Amino acid sequence: MIDKRDDKPFKLKSKYKPSGDQPQAIESLVDNIEGGEKAQILLGATGTGKTYTMSQVISKVNKPTLVIAHNKTLAGQLYGEFKEFFPDNAVEYFVSYYDYYQPEAYVPSSDTYIEKDSSVNDEIDKLRHSATSSLLERNDVIVVASVSCIYGLGSPKEYADSAVSLRPGQEISRDTLLNQLVDIQFERNDIDFQRGCFRVRGDVVEVFPASRDEHAFRVEFFGDEIDRICEIESLTGKTIGEVDHLVLFPATHFVTNDEHMEQSIAKIQAELAEQLQLFESEGKLLEAQRLRQRTEYDIEMLREMGYTSGVENYSRHMDGRLPGEPPYTLLDFFPEDFLIMIDESHMTMGQIKGMYNGDQARKQMLVDYGFRLPSALDNRPLRREEFESHVHQIVYVSATPGEYEMSQTNTIIEQIIRPTGLLDPEIDVRPSMGQMDDLLGEINQRVARDERTFITTLTKKMAEDLTDYLKEMGVKVKYMHSDIKTLERTEIIRDLRLGVFDVLIGINLLREGIDVPEVSLVAILDADKEGFLRNERGLIQTIGRAARNVDGHVIMYADKMTDSMQRAIDETARRREIQIAYNKAHGIVPQTIKKDIRGLISISKTSHNDISKEEMDYESMSRGERKEAINALQKQMQEAAELLDFELAAQMRDLILELKLMD
């Protein structure tokens, strides 16, 4: 039995006090949530402290909260911030646990079957287990997740029902406990004691939960009764303290009991017989043979081990769902009355909408050619309307909310005053005729003041031509294109901030990590060419890149004024007017954001006599040296993850993959 703690409130700790229009935004959001409003939008300009506002709202409404970001990097940043704001509450991190993932696929044109290949990050797997166990044990939980939270996860009821509950004085034999641990996918390992394992020494059983990485538990028996339970350091075995109640959750999220397993296997066999009959009637003998061989092997593994590689493809049968029914996801682990916050909602909601179709197209091919049973199609992400059915109350957070969010609610709460007093930039519209010379003059003014410039173009050719022209004119310039690798991208941004070069040219400068306070000029070429990066939302986001410097200025080069341009200019002017009035009324002088310049990722290179840290030229390395570099990077990646620096860990991961591809 799980005793759920529901009496502990969220306790926000921060040296900041709400300022600007944060108090009004916080009050409005809280009042609307407590008044039962289902959906609302927090329209927060860049740099206005949206995460702090979100934290204030969570602490006041006191509901379990799911915060969804559109990629791992942003989720990692938010997780770090929420951990600082709520040190005494359960702040959890739930993203895809794959460092590398090649999904199972089949390409009929070349008759190529691509097996599923993946590398699981043990640290993230631990954090996922920590998230689900926290949700079942307590209410003061914030889970920061990527869109992987809408993928199938296994039944929360089975997960909770399978949990092993232990107390001192409880009558249970040692062997019964060992059998229960094996049933929930724990492995016995008396030598290498790690997550998801247990070891036995006489009347003492030591268990290492899947949600921990340093502390394990020691269960001491006296006959067929538990004498005491202690929390211990997993490495030294040193006792930390005694425990009154221990709940051990399964070591995998896909778990079922023996009775359900036999029922599931019977359903899998029935579906297999049906699909084999279909293939044989259509003369697809190869597909039939392939399907029989694969499925019968999986059934044998399920019978003997209770698990098989790719068990999630049978999740419909394991969960007892009907064909087409949505899978269980992280959202099902939350209680009914929970709060969802969608960060950068204009990006995240688009991802939630698109996940289902891509997944189905790939899996349908596997089903058609006999690699999987049709029920594998039900191991999938949620459709958007299925996601909506889980929503009790939701806050969309964005500087530029999308059409979907706007269609869901008329309640829009603005937050456009920055704590630093910074204003949205002034905008000039200039003709494209003579734009090169005009731009050169503007760049030279910034160089003289030791400031930087962003230039965004629409085509690769335009970017390359402009780069060549500016180089000929003596400007220190770089072009950041889509082929630039992760580490190079970080290096380019760092060099721009340090003044190694003064101008950065790109097509899409809206991605995360491109906020540079030293940038005082953003030039938008072809501003009148309507499209993804020149619509109102794209323009406002691009304009925001100049909002971190007190001298921020935007120039749009265009031959006509489009509706998108006019709306973006009007919105920026409206915000600027409000910001100026606020600063004047409160005597605030705007100041450029101060942001530390982070060092480059470096790795240790071993020489015969010493170890020196230096930047590496990977291209010129031998295969053996590259292998050493990969090992060193993997170690540093783990260290970064343990320190909760997921942005750095993600960069390490991408670099490791690039190095592996060189061989």
Curated annotation (Swiss-Prot):
GO cellular component: cytoplasm; excinuclease repair complex
Entry-linked InterPro entries: Helicase/UvrB_N, Helicase_ATP-bd, Helicase_C-like, P-loop_NTPase, UVR_dom, UVR_dom_sf, UvrB, UvrB_inter
Molecular function terms from GO: ATP binding; ATP hydrolysis activity; DNA binding; excinuclease ABC activity
UniProt KW keywords: ATP-binding, Cytoplasm, DNA damage, DNA excision, DNA repair, Excision nuclease, Nucleotide-binding, SOS response
Entry-linked Pfam families: Helicase_C (PF00271), ResIII (PF04851), UVR (PF02151), UvrB (PF12344), UvrB_inter (PF17757)
UVR domain residues: 627-662
Gene3D superfamilies the record matches: P-loop containing nucleotide triphosphate hydrolases, UVR domain
Matches recorded under PROSITE patterns: HELICASE_ATP_BIND_1, HELICASE_CTER, UVR
PANTHER family on file: UVRABC SYSTEM PROTEIN B
Assembly notes: Forms a heterotetramer with UvrA during the search for lesions. Interacts with UvrC in an incision complex.
Function noted in UniProt: The UvrABC repair system catalyzes the recognition and processing of DNA lesions. A damage recognition complex composed of 2 UvrA and 2 UvrB subunits scans DNA for abnormalities. Upon binding of the UvrA(2)B(2) complex to a putative damaged site, the DNA wraps around one UvrB monomer. DNA wrap is dependent on ATP binding by UvrB and probably causes local melting of the DNA helix, facilitating insertion of UvrB beta-hairpin between the DNA strands. Then UvrB probes one DNA strand for the presence of a lesion.
Identification of the protein by name: UvrABC system protein B
